[in-house]
UniProtKB/Swiss-Prot annotation:
PROSITE patterns: LRR (PS51450), PROTEIN_KINASE_ATP (PS00107), PROTEIN_KINASE_DOM (PS50011), PROTEIN_KINASE_ST (PS00108). One of its GO terms (cellular component) is plasma membrane. The active site is at D1014 (proton acceptor). LRR repeats lie at residues 109-131, 135-157, 161-181, 186-207, 213-234, 235-257, 258-280, 282-304, 305-325, 329-350, 353-375, 378-401, 402-423, 428-450, 452-474, 476-499, 500-523, 524-547, 548-570, 572-594, 664-686, 688-711, 712-735, 736-758. Receptor with a serine/threonine-protein kinase activity. Involved in the perception of systemin, a peptide hormone responsible for the systemic activation of defense genes in leaves of wounded plants. May also regulate, in response to brassinosteroid binding, a signaling cascade involved in plant development. This is Systemin receptor SR160. The keyword Cell wall biogenesis/degradation does not apply. Residues 1-34 form the signal peptide. GO terms for molecular function: ATP binding; protein serine kinase activity; protein serine/threonine kinase activity; steroid binding. SR160 is almost identical to BRI1, a brassinosteroid receptor identified in Lycopersicon esculentum. Competition experiments indicate that brassinosteroid and systemin are probably perceived by different regions of the receptor. It is found in: Cell membrane. The chain crosses the membrane at residues 803-823.
Amino acid sequence: MKAHKTVFNQHPLSLNKLFFVLLLIFFLPPASPAASVNGLYKDSQQLLSFKAALPPTPTLLQNWLSSTDPCSFTGVSCKNSRVSSIDLSNTFLSVDFSLVTSYLLPLSNLESLVLKNANLSGSLTSAAKSQCGVTLDSIDLAENTISGPISDISSFGVCSNLKSLNLSKNFLDPPGKEMLKGATFSLQVLDLSYNNISGFNLFPWVSSMGFVELEFFSIKGNKLAGSIPELDFKNLSYLDLSANNFSTVFPSFKDCSNLQHLDLSSNKFYGDIGSSLSSCGKLSFLNLTNNQFVGLVPKLPSESLQYLYLRGNDFQGVYPNQLADLCKTVVELDLSYNNFSGMVPESLGECSSLELVDISNNNFSGKLPVDTLLKLSNIKTMVLSFNKFVGGLPDSFSNLPKLETLDMSSNNLTGIIPSGICKDPMNNLKVLYLQNNLFKGPIPDSLSNCSQLVSLDLSFNYLTGSIPSSLGSLSKLKDLILWLNQLSGEIPQELMYLQALENLILDFNDLTGPIPASLSNCTKLNWISLSNNQLSGEIPASLGRLSNLAILKLGNNSISGNIPAELGNCQSLIWLDLNTNFLNGSIPPPLFKQSGNIAVALLTGKRYVYIKNDGSKECHGAGNLLEFGGIRQEQLDRISTRHPCNFTRVYRGITQPTFNHNGSMIFLDLSYNKLEGSIPKELGAMYYLSILNLGHNDLSGMIPQQLGGLKNVAILDLSYNRFNGTIPNSLTSLTLLGEIDLSNNNLSGMIPESAPFDTFPDYRFANNSLCGYPLPLPCSSGPKSDANQHQKSHRRQASLAGSVAMGLLFSLFCIFGLIIVAIETKKRRRKKEAALEAYMDGHSHSATANSAWKFTSAREALSINLAAFEKPLRKLTFADLLEATNGFHNDSLVGSGGFGDVYKAQLKDGSVVAIKKLIHVSGQGDREFTAEMETIGKIKHRNLVPLLGYCKVGEERLLVYEYMKYGSLEDVLHDRKKTGIKLNWPARRKIAIGAARGLAFLHHNCIPHIIHRDMKSSNVLLDENLEARVSDFGMARLMSAMDTHLSVSTLAGTPGYVPPEYYQSFRCSTKGDVYSYGVVLLELLTGKQPTDSADFGDNNLVGWVKLHAKGKITDVFDRELLKEDASIEIELLQHLKVACACLDDRHWKRPTMIQVMAMFKEIQAGSGMDSTSTIGADDVNFSGVEGGIEMGINGSIKEGNELSKHL
């Protein structure tokens, strides 16, 4: 009775408990023992106690109630009347893992515990202090924020029967020294993928833990490096080491007789494959993608191999005969992105089980091996793109009934597209890519038989005839891409039936007739591109119903009528190009009402090029945005308008989400039409607009003040209209403006004297009634001045002879005067340069201890006119450079970048130089190129790589630079094996200061100020004294002013450095350079590359540091630095704070580079550094910077929250 009182009488819910027990007895089968009732009751109490410990959330585990059978609880399963399984995946528990160990692990009959993506935090150590049910054999804690060393896994030693443990996608670190003694494991499954595990000691730890029974082991997506000892897991069937930093020979196995799955992709493995795998008879999956294997493909175990991926290595030679042995078993074969050559052998046709073959991006040649390919009766995906195959495409491909994807793009295929390619009514073809070939003739009507077709790309061929109306029957078609052919006739009305259509791209054809209004029935359309045709009629107002439409390109046609106001209803529109048509009427204000209603990222992942026009009379519009999947960039010469229109720059990339919140259009080109009336003031609300071209119309009235609201505009063209009045002062607030053209209007008054107007050339304001800089006509100072000018004019008219005499005397006076002025100018220049050197270093506001840095609006530093530099460039002949590089031989090649290849060369005078061979920039005329060279050559600073000379022959443009002995910071920092240099902290600090000094010079001491646009560690070179020299700073100038727009596309090859605002506005700024510099500084502090899937997974270096800012921030520092000298930790934190300030997501909050230099000076003032790595008297002088910077040295650079604010 006493026991009963304990259970019932002393509890306020005793009646509920009694009812619960009776309920269980009633429903239990007769054979169930009474103990099961008590056991299930205990399980229920344990679960309810766990719920009670959770944060109070009304929607969390709502049916976990004392009056409910626990076997019906959300996520709970029972066996033999006991809780046996708990699955709370994707439940936002938001608790420490210790609660799990206290309440859930002890459940005595629990077999499986799944808490994937449950927002768990804390460490694993609490498990060691808890009980664990003897039946528990599987724990899944993936996708949480559990931290601590992986050696904490030893805490699960209390779970004696644990067989499977999934800790993937957490924040676990390398194994620590402390491990639970006496812990024994019989784990069969261990998943540690996507954590923060780095270093070289993982495998010794695995051996020490006695994981000898492992069958599944994954450490994918970590930061492991070093060599791998001989692997001794006799039961291992699944091993995934992909996406790490291994740079070593292919691992060897003591016993791989049970190995079935091996993934080593995305590392730097090299060496012999065949001998290591020779005894792996059960191997069915082998992925060696993106490694450094070279030479011939070795013989591989052929008994069971089904999936073989060798993509992205340097395998060479003809198609490997060794693969013929695999034909009985292989299902998927990927040999893409290697250097295979020759013809595809007939033996491939014997691979009867093959479902996927990808041999793209190699050098295979010869006639398309049709007979061989037709033997692949089970093939579903066939990718042969980017090779050199010739010949035609036969009807017989229809004999492959399972074929879903056929990609033959970018070859040299000829003939016609066969009419019988889908003659089998049961065909499954979904993707047909034949772009960038030499096909001629019509598009066959019979393509309508490809009823499953989703994507059709026949662009970049020589197809003729009309677009078949029968294509309208392809109900699943999403992509219809036919641009750059010779298609004629009208756009078929039947396309209205393509209800799934997302992309209709028909540019550069000879299409005529109207734009079908019925296209509005294709409600999923994202991209309509019909430019450079002969279309006529009006723009259908019904297109305004396309709420998903993001890009509408109708330029270079014969379209007439008004711009439909209904286009303002296209709430996702970001790109509107209507240039060079016959549009009339006014610009409708409702066109801009969509501002603030942008949909999210409809075009993410589309490959494109943007080609900037050169602005010549023959070249209309701002440029062309083109879909570019499956096309070789060197084939752009085939674009018909390229010949009369020399493009200044080609940008390529993959479309990114344009906005992460509400925004507006980024491109609007209405130029070369017959538009009338005034500019609607509503246009000023288009905050994210980057390019606005209204030139060559008949617009009139005053330029509205509201255009000052276009805060992100980089290109503004209002030329050749009838605008009157003055240039509105509001335009001076457009700080990102890189190009403006107000010429050929009726504007009057003074050109604004402030930036950015003081950087534009005079012809951008010509043929108006404007005055002031940069025009030669000064503005009159008042009535008196006007009267004087009138009198002078009268006197000149009265005495021609006197005027001539005065002119001669004046000319003589000018000659003598210029000699005197030249002498005085040279003296002043020397004084100015000396003053500049002093100015560029001495100013810094002193700060009190413990104060925080504050950035205020600062005046620009005094600037140097580029003409102040005297030393002329050395002109070299092409023969000189050809001889110096041994004909630009690969042996002389020392690097490659976004602007061209770099060669080491020794000139005849013995001097060693670096020669950059530019990519073709055929849009750059000789005069413009020479002018840019002369300008860039005058930019001299000890932290910039100086341009010594140049050479131009035909289309070739060669630049000669001072040679930097130690190459790039990227190589020295991240590839020590290549350079043999180890950078200690004083050396890294010196590099950080030098790079900042060079960038500050470009931003603040040149007119016009120079934006680097591609600041990164590979553009920081190191001379013989390991002094940092910023390189490639002039390339953006050389490639034209258009680089202030869409430069993010050029930077797509170096992700990790691009500031977030570039993805929104596609333009560059000095604050963007500051962000990129902040990434370089992080590289110096952490020793890590800006992007590395092995280090960061889907994140990058900035995001990784941000995550650590929430915890122990010192973990981000390069451990080698602290091993050498632990006392530098405070100094590293101070420099990290500088980096975080540079990396502020809000570009206006970032410091200028002058302010960055001031921070470094303050750090040095408080740390007593040696003079070899400090800012001295000959560096940047900051005392004239208004507002100043304050920084606390002694005290308190707080970890965590304060740093995260800057990120």
